[in-house]
């Protein structure tokens, strides 16, 4: 076993943790990752030799690879995701709670000798710009070269992070294994995993993560959802900041004035499409800072500032096309990994919605010849992993260690009725109620839940690392700190008519909604009118010029459906009852206000 990693680590706490893990998991070899391009290429070559990775046609996708996972390891596994806090009360009713001591014992049994026959990789990573007051350092120990390569794209990773950590910095311990030890001479499978014993566990007492049995994105790239949301939200609650499941964009109007917005949507509701929106309206510009996670802190001037802690995109491929998101296709043109997409005869990738006609002679995501009219060629949760700086609409402030000031926070979901196209909260408290009441039709990003309506407060249901009622209270507390808070808005691109057709054209036309939000943050009063559920655009207030949208359709999008809203309020109140006495009274008061005003 190579011991040269020891000489490169000056942090005694990190050194002793690594030694502890090695003793527990018994790897054949140990490797400290430096994050270099040479290391990345060597690991990609190793995976090609093992039949795990397929290089794409370099003329179509330079330095890109396709990976196929096991069909039993294709999405975030919420039923195996646990939050361990001293008391169950601290984790709250929306999290799977386990006693930390019991869970540690269970995991130690699973991890014992689990890396036999494999290489243990030490992956130092930084969430957030290097040397930013926002940033957190983690070290992931993993036995998956796919994870190492993905972490190079998704995080700032390697020697520079180790240097920043120094000999006494704080770091988050992240231990990951695919859970498939190899006996001497045993041949490995292309995608090792152990679905029966899958565990993704967060220990809030020492800010550590242990993940076993899955090699898939959110379960295995522990910097992403585990550190940047579940651990960071807990930390933010203690320290007075927010870790949110939000995109961050810069919107510039034709006069050249720019504002930054953050927006929360549940998985697969168009976050990446909005983050990379290509405006059709002349003179407008939308630039991307991130498409998934925002860390938000009060700045010295009293405004809220946001950074994207990530370094890459882990985007849903399905439906991404030159029409829906040309910037996403440009982003993953080179230096990207594709997981569970189809492979075309000429060495390109394909997924449903990429083109109207599927190419002939494809290999599907399970490695079989694809048959037209049969199963989908790509898995519905197929992904591209692409570098942030490859995005053609990347905002110049993307790496600013201080973050960017937010003027609007937007909440959205996939709702076919009741919820208007856009509306503005009457107050911060009303806005927090809007976030707490979010619900959406579910998608393939979550195992076993396709097509149901589920509550997803702030789009944080799977990612909040502590009691959600305390999280709502934390959001409310920002109104008492004398801050210059962003305005809060709700949007819904997904209303349908009586024929089941989407009313709003969506995609690049969503800029028209951003334009209204932009003007509202400028204090334009004439473009909105007050209703019980918030400020809605007046008929003339929303720019619909050049849109094929009838007056009836516009009315449907911008009218308060009193009966629908009464049902909505009652539904939210019923959901909030799961939090019992912990539920903040201010949110319940907002629900009562809406109800009484609707009468």
UniProtKB/Swiss-Prot annotation:
A Gene Ontology cellular-component term: cytosol
BP GO terms, sorted: cellular response to glucose stimulus; gluconeogenesis; glycerol biosynthetic process from pyruvate; oxaloacetate metabolic process; propionate catabolic process; response to lipid; response to starvation
Pfam families in alphabetical order: PEPCK_GTP (PF00821), PEPCK_N (PF17297)
Subcellular location: Cytoplasm
Residues the record marks as active site: 269
Annotated EC: 4.1.1.32
Gene Ontology molecular function terms on file: GTP binding; manganese ion binding; phosphoenolpyruvate carboxykinase (GTP) activity
Note on cofactor: Binds 1 Mn(2+) ion per subunit.
Ribonucleoprotein is among the record's keywords: no
Binding site for Mn(2+): 225, 245, 292
Pathways per UniProt: Carbohydrate biosynthesis; gluconeogenesis
SUPFAM superfamilies for the chain: PEP carboxykinase N-terminal domain (SSF68923), PEP carboxykinase-like (SSF53795)
Residues binding substrate: 76, 216-218, 267, 381-383
UniProt binding sites for GTP: 268-273, 383, 414, 507-510
Function as written in the Swiss-Prot or TrEMBL entry: Catalyzes the conversion of oxaloacetate (OAA) to phosphoenolpyruvate (PEP), the rate-limiting step in the metabolic pathway that produces glucose from lactate and other precursors derived from the citric acid cycle.
NCBIfam families cross-referenced by the UniProt entry: PRK04210.1 (NF003253)
Quaternary structure, from the entry: Monomer.
Protein's name according to its UniProt entry: Phosphoenolpyruvate carboxykinase [GTP]
Top-level taxonomy: Bacteria, Pseudomonadati, Chlamydiota, Chlamydiia, Chlamydiales
Gene: pckG
């Amino acid at each position: 076993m190579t011991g040269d990693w020891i000489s490169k680590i000056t942090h005694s706490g990190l050194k002793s943790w690594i030694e502890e893990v090695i003793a527990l998991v018994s790897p054949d070899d140990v490797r400290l990752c430096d994050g270099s391009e040479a290391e990345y290429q060597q690991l990609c070559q190793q995976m090609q030799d093992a039949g795990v990775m397929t290089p794409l046609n370099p003329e179509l996708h330079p330095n890109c690879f396709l990976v196929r996972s096991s069909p039993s390891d294709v999405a975030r596994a919420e039923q195996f995701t646990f939050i361990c806090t001293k008391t169950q009360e601290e984790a709250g009713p929306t999290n799977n709670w386990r006693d930390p001591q019991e869970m540690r014992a269970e995991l130690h049994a699973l991890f014992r000798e689990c890396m036999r026959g494999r290489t243990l990789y030490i992956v130092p990573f930084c969430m957030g710009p290097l040397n930013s007051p926002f940033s957190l350092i983690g070290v992931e120990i993993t036995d998956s070269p796919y994870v190492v390569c993905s972490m190079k794209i998704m995080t700032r990773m390697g020697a520079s992070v180790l240097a920043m950590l120094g000999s006494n910095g704080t770091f988050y311990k992240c231990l990951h294994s695919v859970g498939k030890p190899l006996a001497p001479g045993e041949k490995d499978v292309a995608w090792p995993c152990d679905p029966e014993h899958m565990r993704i566990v967060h220990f809030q007492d020492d800010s550590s993560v242990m993940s076993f049995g899955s090699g898939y994105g959110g379960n295995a790239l522990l910097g992403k959802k585990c550190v940047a949301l579940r651990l960071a939200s807990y930390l933010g609650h203690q320290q007075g900041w927010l870790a949110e499941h939000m995109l961050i964009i810069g919107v510039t109007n034709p006069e050249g004035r720019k504002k930054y917005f953050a927006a929360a949507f549940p998985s697969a509701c168009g976050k990446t499409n909005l983050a990379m929106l290509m405006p059709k309206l002349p003179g407008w510009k939308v630039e991307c800072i991130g498409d998934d996670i925002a860390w938000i802190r009060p700045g010295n001037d009293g405004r809220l500032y946001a950074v994207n802690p990530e370094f890459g995109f882990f985007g849903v491929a399905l439906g991404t096309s030159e029409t829906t998101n040309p910037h996403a296709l440009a982003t993953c043109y080179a230096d990207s990994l594709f997981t569970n997409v189809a492979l075309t005869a000429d060495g390109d990738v394909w997924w449903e919605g990429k083109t109207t006609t599927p190419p002939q002679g494809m290999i599907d995501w399970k490695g079989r010849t694809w048959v037209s009219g049969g199963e989908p060629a790509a898995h519905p949760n197929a992904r591209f992993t692409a570098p942030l700086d490859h995005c053609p609409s990347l905002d110049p402030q993307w790496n600013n260690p201080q973050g960017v000031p937010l003027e609007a926070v937007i909440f959205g979901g996939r709702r076919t009725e009741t919820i208007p196209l856009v509306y503005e909260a009457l107050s911060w408290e009303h806005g927090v109620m809007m976030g707490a009441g979010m619900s959406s039709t579910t998608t393939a990003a979550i195992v076993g839940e396709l097509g149901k309506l589920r509550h997803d407060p702030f789009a944080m249901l799977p990612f909040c690392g502590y009691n959600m009622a305390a999280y709502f209270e934390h959001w409310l507390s920002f109104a008492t700190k004398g801050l210059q808070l962003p305005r809060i808005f709700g949007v819904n691109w997904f209303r349908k008519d009586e024929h089941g057709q989407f009313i709003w054209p969506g995609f690049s036309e969503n800029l028209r909604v951003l334009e209204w939000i932009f003007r509202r943050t400028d204090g334009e009063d004439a473009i909105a009118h007050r209703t019980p559920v918030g400020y809605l655009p007046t008929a003339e207030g929303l720019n619909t010029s050049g849109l094929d949208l009838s007056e009836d359709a516009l009315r449907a999008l911008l009218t308060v459906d009193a009966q629908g809203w009464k049902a909505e309020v009652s539904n939210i109140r019923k959901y909030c009852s799961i939090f019992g006495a912990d539920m903040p009274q201010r949110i319940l008061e907002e629900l009562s206000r809406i109800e009484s005003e609707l009468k």
